[in-house]
Curated annotation (Swiss-Prot):
Localization in the cell: Cytoplasm
UniProt KW keywords: Cytoplasm, Fatty acid biosynthesis, Fatty acid metabolism, Lipid biosynthesis, Lipid metabolism, Magnesium, Metal-binding, Transferase
Keyword Hydrolase among UniProt keywords: no
Protein name stated in the entry: Holo-[acyl-carrier-protein] synthase
Catalytic activity: apo-[ACP] + CoA = holo-[ACP] + adenosine 3',5'-bisphosphate + H(+)
An individual GO BP term: fatty acid biosynthetic process
Family matches, as InterPro entries: 4-PPantetheinyl_Trfase_dom, 4-PPantetheinyl_Trfase_dom_sf, ACPS, Ppantetheine-prot_Trfase_dom
GO molecular function ontology, one term from the record: holo-[acyl-carrier-protein] synthase activity
Gene3D superfamilies recorded: 4'-phosphopantetheinyl transferase domain
EC number annotated for this UniProt entry: 2.7.8.7
Bilayer-spanning residue ranges: none
The keyword Lipid metabolism is assigned to this record: yes
Annotated positions binding Mg(2+): D8, E59
Length: 126
């Protein structure tokens, strides 16, 4: 059963400007610990796109749950990883998953400088 659909678009240029002002603070604000480890391994030229995609993905997932970031879920409650083929995998913190019995999250990410887009579908697995 469909729980919700969410989408978000982010200007990569906007993230570049934020990174110029706050090089480490922004990443620490929106990335979960596993994502921060990935981020640290990236070439600096990839930082803005990586952060823009994670920001858009987390916004899209929160919208698919029918809420927004800061309305019962925050950036660090959602972790975006990739499988061996690059497919995005979404992990939601245990504190949030207690609100839903079981669900599947489908996420698609795309970027074409200067924008990136995320599209999320949350469905009940019951």
């Amino acid at each position: 059963m469909l729980i919700g659909v969410g989408t978000d678009i982010v200007q990569i240029l906007r993230i570049e400007k934020i990174l110029h002002l706050y090089p480490e603070l922004f990443a620490k604000r929106i990335l979960a610990s596993k994502e921060l480890r990935q981020f640290a391994l990236l070439n600096k030229t990839s930082h803005a796109t990586f952060l823009a995609k994670r920001f858009a993905a987390k916004e899209a997932v929160s919208k698919a749950f029918g809420i927004g970031i800061g309305q019962g879920i925050n950036f660090k409650d959602i972790t975006i990883l990739n499988d061996d083929l690059g497919k995005p995998i979404v992990e939601v913190s245990a504190s949030y998953t207690k609100k839903y019995s079981s669900f599947n999250i489908h996420l698609s990410l795309s970027d074409d400088y200067p924008v990136c887009v995320a599209f999320a579908i949350v469905e009940s697995s019951c």
